Amino acid sequence: MKELTTDIGKKHEQEAADFLKNLKYKIIEQNFKLLPVGEIDIIAKDKNTIVFVEVKYRKTKDFGTPAEFVTKSKQKKVIKTALCYVKKNNIKADIRFDVISICQNEIEHIKNAFCPENYFF
């Protein structure tokens, strides 16, 4: 039976979470949803920094790396959702936006992949 897209996504989000755990990150939440604003694949803590992670998977790089599919629109949604999360949870720590790109058996972790300063809300 063919794997559903949501099952494939969850599998690779878990793979990304395990990857971060191996780097000593503490996973705070996975699949955080704030409707209708957006969702965040992984919220983690790296030392004293709260990290909001977008996970992208592609079978091949024929049309670009998975990270290249994190559009400006998606970045904006992740940032808005993260800022709401920070406010709701009264977080005073530094925050960062990372992307984990998964293609075949290769994982690429891009720290500071995008930042809120580039957007006007």
Question: Where is each model-derived feature located?
Answer:
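Short, glycine/acidic-enriched loop or turn micro-motifs at the edges of active sites
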Residues: 32-34, 57, 101
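Conserved catalytic cores of phosphodiester-cleaving nucleases, focusing on short active-site segments
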Residues: 40-61, 78
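Mg2+/Mn2+-dependent nuclease catalytic core
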Residues: 59-79, 84
